[in-house]
Amino acid sequence: MLLVLLLCTCVRAQIAERPTSGELHAGIQKLQVLGSALYMAAHPDDENTRLIAYLANVDKAETAYLSLTRGDGGQNLIAPDIRELLGLTRTQELLAARRIDGGTQFFSRANDFGYSKHPDETFNI
């Protein structure tokens, strides 16, 4: 019984971050706006971060970016063994960008297979 009591007092739950007064004020202002925007693009480096930041912070719209791929295709000159790591790196970059610009990040399951010069090349991949 004593062991259970000691375990219960030692276990700590994750402490929630307390928002600053500025973050609370921005959140209240955002509640007064009825609007949302979804920015869609094929690759992680195709987004317009200035537009996302403007819509999220100035217009106070619920703003999100949908990247259809994670950018693991890269350029055809990049070695195939780096593809997955490149996708992971670009994913983390997008998540960090959304923490800065105030948007929400979404991904689809589309596979990035690199550049194609001709439609036949695309369908063969």
Where do the model's predicted regions map?
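Bacterial N-terminal signal peptides
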Residues: 1-12
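Active-site rim/loop-helix segments in enzyme catalytic domains that contact anionic ligands
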Residues: 14-125
